[in-house]
Amino acid sequence: MVNELAILSNMLDIDIWEVVDAAKTKPFGFQSFRPGPGVGGHCIPIDPKYLSFKTRQIGQPVRFVELAQEINNSMPNYVISRISELMNKQEILLKNSKILILGVAYKKDIGDTRESPAIDIIELLLNKSAEVSFHDPYIDELTINKERISKEQDIDNFSNYDMVIIHTPHTSFNKIDFENIRTLIFDTTGSFTISNAERI
């Protein structure tokens, strides 16, 4: 639900992160949910499909669960639309642009890419003829559709890139001096305080 609210908030020119922060001031009953690029791992993206399959067999589909899956599955496309919009404002074409993905694991501080939204995001970027590299301290190699994705070793200098997409908020990324980066930054997790970045 929070991903759908993030999309709606952007359309209404409302900062979803300010909304979440305001909700935190409620003295009781608040559970924080944060938008992101989708869901990954071997449980959340997969297990509800079994439930949906079984409930459809008995003629009682779980519509809310299926709608949540649909929205979460659409988030990589939403990320692409947002970065395209940001780049267009700077008169940078997505085609042939150089894009760096920071973090490709499905969650922070692990080296697991199963069902990671980063895979879909990279695939979409490649389909649009962007040149994509990644950096993830927990993952040494990444191959998508038989294409090996270049790993960037130097994360102190992003000047070679047109766009940096923060996908996974690994703790080690806290050491990066994002404030002094002049490259476009899109933070899909809202985990970093970066004055010059756009957040999902």
For each predicted feature, which ranges?
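Structural/interface elements that position substrates and couple domains in central-metabolism enzymes
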Residues: 1-200
